[in-house]
Design a protein with these regions (language model features):
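A cross-kingdom marker of C-terminal helix-rich interaction/assembly modules
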Residues: 1-105, 109-256
Length: 256
C-alpha cells in the first residue's frame, strides 16, 4: 500500500496508509538493514558535512530543503533505534515521547519536499529556523517557527494527492496523544503504575505482554521512516536507493 501511494499518490490509498501507519505494525523491518540503506541514501543525496574548526563541529554548507529533509530522516531513523531499546526495557513514557519526535520529523520531510525543487514561503521559513539553531547560535535564535498544522497538512496532501480533512484530523489526534508523553501529562504518567506492587516501575515496566503490545508502534515507526526515505530518494531522482529501500519491505520478515 505505501509503495503504491509513493508511486501514484491516489487519494483512497493515501487515506489507507495514514490509518495503517497510525494503528498497525503490519510489516517487519530489520533496523540494522534500514540504517545501512538510509545512510547510503544520505551519502548519495547530500554527502558529508564539513568540519568547522572555529566551532568544533561538523556542518553542512548547503542550506537547502534537500539537506534539511535528509537530516530529518537521520533524526527519525535514530529515534526508531531508540524506541526499540526503550520498548524492550519497558520505559514507555520516554518511548511515547520519542514517537512524537519521529512522527514530527517524518511529517516535516513531506512538507519540505512537497513541491521540490520549488519551495514555498513556509518552507523557506522552516529552513531558516532550522539552520538558525547552529552550535554557536541556538541560544539567541529568534526566527519564527512554521505552524505545525501547515506541516501536517502538507504530509496529508502528499500521501492523499489532495487536501483531506478526515485524514488531517486523524493526524491531529495522533499528535495530541503522543504530545502527552512529552509534556508529562497525568494519564501518561499513570500508565506505568503497577497496582499489584504499588510502584511506578521506575526501572521499566516488566510485563512482556505490555512490551509486545507497544512493539507494534516500533513497527509502525520503522515503516513510516523507511518510506519517508523512499519518498526522498524518488523525489531526488535516486533510483537505485529508492529501489533498495522499497525492496527491504518485501524481504525483511522481522524487526530485529
Amino acid at each position: 500500500l505505501i509503495k503504491s501511494v509513493i508511486n501514484s499518490k491516489s487519494q483512497a490509498q493515501g487515506n489507507l496508509i495514514i490509518e495503517r501507519l497510525a494503528m498497525t505494525g503490519c510489516v517487519g523491518v530489520r533496523l540494522d538493514q534500514m540504517a545501512i540503506l538510509l545512510e547510503k541514501l544520505r551519502k548519495a543525496a547530500i554527502g558529508e558535512p564539513r568540519w568547522v574548526a572555529e566551532k568544533q563541529a561538523f556542518e553542512y554548507q548547503d542550506r537547502s530543503a534537500k539537506v534539511v529533509a535528509v537530516l530529518k530522516l537521520v533524526r527519525a531513523a535514530h529515534g526508531v533505534s531508540a524506541i526499540d531499546l526503550l520498548c524492550r526495557a519497558g520505559l514507555f513514557v520516554d518511548f511515547g515521547a520519542l514517537i512524537r519526535c519521529i512522527n514530527d520529523s517524518v511529517s516535516e520531510i513531506y512538507f519540505l519536499l512537497e513541491e521540490f525543487p520549488r519551495t514555498s514561503g513556509n518552507v523557506d521559513q522552516f529552513i531558516a529556523e532550522f539552520f538558525a539553531r547552529t552550535i554557536d547560535g541556538h541560544l539567541s535564535d529568534d526566527t519564527p517557527q512554521v505552524p505545525t498544522k501547515k506541516i501536517r497538512s502538507a504530509f496529508v496532501r502528499v500521501l492523499s494527492g489532495s487536501h483531506d480533512d478526515q485524514a488531517r484530523k486523524l493526524l491531529e489526534r495522533i499528535f495530541r496523544t503522543f504530545s502527552g508523553y512529552i509534556h508529562a501529562s497525568y494519564s501518561h504518567i499513570m500508565e506505568v503504575y503497577n497496582g499489584d506492587t504499588c510502584d511506578f516501575n521506575l526501572r521499566g515496566v516488566p510485563s512482556i505482554v505490555q512490551r509486545d503490545m507497544r512493539m507494534q508502534h516500533v513497527d509502525v515507526a520503522a515503516i513510516s521512516v523507511l518510506h519517508a526515505g523512499a519518498f526522498i530518494a524518488q523525489t531526488l531522482g535516486l533510483t537505485e536507493q529508492h529501489g533498495e529501500i522499497m525492496k527491504l519491505e518485501d524481504t525483511s520478515p522481522t524487526l530485529s
